[in-house]
Amino acid sequence: MHPREQTIFALSSGRPPSAIAVVRASGSQAGTALRKLAGAIPAARTAKRVLLRDSVGEAIDDAVILWFPAPASATGEDIAEFHVHGSRAVVNALIAALSSIDDARAAEPGEFTRRAFENGKIDLTEAEGLDDLIHADTDRQRRQALRQLQGLLGDRARGWRKELIDASALIEAGIDFADEEDVPEDLARPALEKIAQLRREIEQTLAASARGERLRDGLTVAIAGPPNAGKSTLLNRLARREAAIVSPHAGTTRDIIEVYLDLDGYPVTLIDTAGIRETDDPVEQEGVRRARDRVAKADLVLWLSDDHGGEPDQTIRSGETSLWLIRNKIDLAGPENDGAKPGRFETKAGQSAPPWRFRISASRGDGVDDLVSALTAFAEKLLGSSEAGVITRLRHRNILRDAVASLAKAETLAGRGDELVAEELRIAIHLMGRLLGRVDIDDILDSLFKEFCIGK
């Protein structure tokens, strides 16, 4: 039997031990599994308490079972669910009993979702939304992923595809029945009006695409500066834990340290880098090289210095990354800090602005709240709200850009031959099929479903 035709099973809940464990089976032998382990198939969608037994009659557990017959199930196949006590021993015994059933095997990662897709229960954009939901770290990411899973982009793409098919039908009718007297003379005009409208709608969706993609991926903020400027101390203060080793000796941090922050629902990866300076130490040189590399790729650089100086060099200043200069250690005595208030620096009338944007004490926390508020506002400006993201992946953007190009070409070809316009519409319709996962997507499926956990 082909693997796609076999019944699959897996633990679908969290890893044991737990209060309850859910083991799910999907496929033609799901009903057989219920009969062999529980004695009978219960009424559809009705929970039933039973004593599960293995093939030799040994009791496995006092469990609750459910039956979801095809096609009205999550995968479109027969599904059996076993809700058992969540010990490793119980789960292992149940998995072993299911393994003894003919044509049943353990599921691969994402295989339940793949079968749901292949049986038309979800489209590819919804499967991608489920993947994003599983991997969501913040509430804004969760809301965006849930909207995708519920068909936000898929419904829109299906609507566009239908409109394109309608426009194509008008063009094709004009070609096929050009000599018929009862066919209107200019069927292309309403078709071209529809094409122009669709192109504008897709362009508007693309215009907001960057925010959806960036919210999914999150922002990267690098803490950089000279050695012993307090970078690791600031990282620990923002992370609210001891993520990096702090030492009074310069050059303690040699490698990149990353921590994750949730700033009001915005995902931020915070990076602590090695102190940037000239050095003869080959290990420290590698740390400085890596620091410069991550600084160049970050969305924002927090450059820390103290009253001993340490301004960023021209390479860092001239980069495309946003740069905030921060004066740290204001709790220490020094002419630069006399009378200085922590937080964002406000320039008074007639006063020249200093090179730094914030004054803080990372060790005491002075001014850090203002810095966090500014970071949150920065993230909000770049990422927007979760409701803005219709396009959340580069795949979506590339396909829709190609569709816009085909529609624009169809408009320019108007008057040169309806056959040329019809061909561009066929390309655009095909692209909508790719977006929904109905054509030319085997390589995409293999990559996507491998990201899912086993049992999903």
Curated annotation (Swiss-Prot):
The keyword Membrane does not apply. GO terms for biological process: tRNA methylation; tRNA wobble uridine modification. CDD domains: trmE, TrmE_N. Binds 1 potassium ion per subunit. The keyword Magnesium applies. GTP binds at residues 228-233, 247-253, 272-275. Its cofactor is K(+). Homodimer. Heterotetramer of two MnmE and two MnmG subunits. This is tRNA modification GTPase MnmE. It comes from Nitrobacter winogradskyi (strain ATCC 25391 / DSM 10237 / CIP 104748 / NCIMB 11846 / Nb-255). The lineage of its organism: Bacteria, Pseudomonadati, Pseudomonadota, Alphaproteobacteria, Hyphomicrobiales.
